[in-house]
Amino acid sequence: MKFPLLLALLVGGAFALHLSSEASDSKSPLVDESLPREAEISRPEVEESPPGEQLMSLEEEEEEEEEEGSGSEGALGNEGAVSGQDVTDENLQSPKEEDTTSLMGDSGFKTGRYLLVRRPECFNKAQLVCRSCYRGTLASIHSFSVNFRIQSFVRGINQGQVWIGGRIVGWGRCKRFRWIDGSSWNFAYWAAGQPRRGGGRCVTLCTRGGHWRRSGCGKRRPFICAY
């Protein structure tokens, strides 16, 4: 009586073990297929800078290096000092009276007086004229109202742009805009696409619209002195 019962228990145990083994084998392919998905989910994402911005920056650097290397622009130090290689105080000629127009006594310019010099000069020489002849500097602009009034002041001349006192100092990632008189760069009125798509290290004001543009510092333009 005991032997048939023992035999039945042994057969039942072997059958249960066989079913467990088949179930384990049938699940293993699903586990293997899921492993790559887990790896992909856990892999950290890497952010990359937009290629257009990177290429644009490289193009700007190449343009500036070409301009500086050609000698067409005077060297501007990190503090905005004017180079004396091209002109000195001794051989500087003051602009003729008919080449200048003064804007003073206007309620819109309580912080200073402005002078338009129509005789075109490069940026460095324009700054030297402002400093030596009028004891001032190329104009710095800190509000839209002043920018608008200066643009209204110069829009009648037969030139598209005039120098103001903004320029780039530093190189590469350390580049920044500064006013040549040392005042805070707390306002800007750039034209569309500027300053990123502009070339040159000096800043002009457009006589139509009053927007600002970057320009090669060696170009000769009329300019605005503040004193």
Curated annotation (Swiss-Prot):
Stretches for region Disordered: 21-105
Amino acid composition bias (Basic and acidic residues), ranges on this chain: 34-46
Coiled coil stretches, renumbered: none
Main location: secreted
Superkingdom of origin: Eukaryota
Keyword Signal set for record: yes
Signal peptide: 1-16
UniProt name for this protein: Bone marrow proteoglycan
Species the sequence originates in: Rattus norvegicus
Name of the encoding gene: Prg2
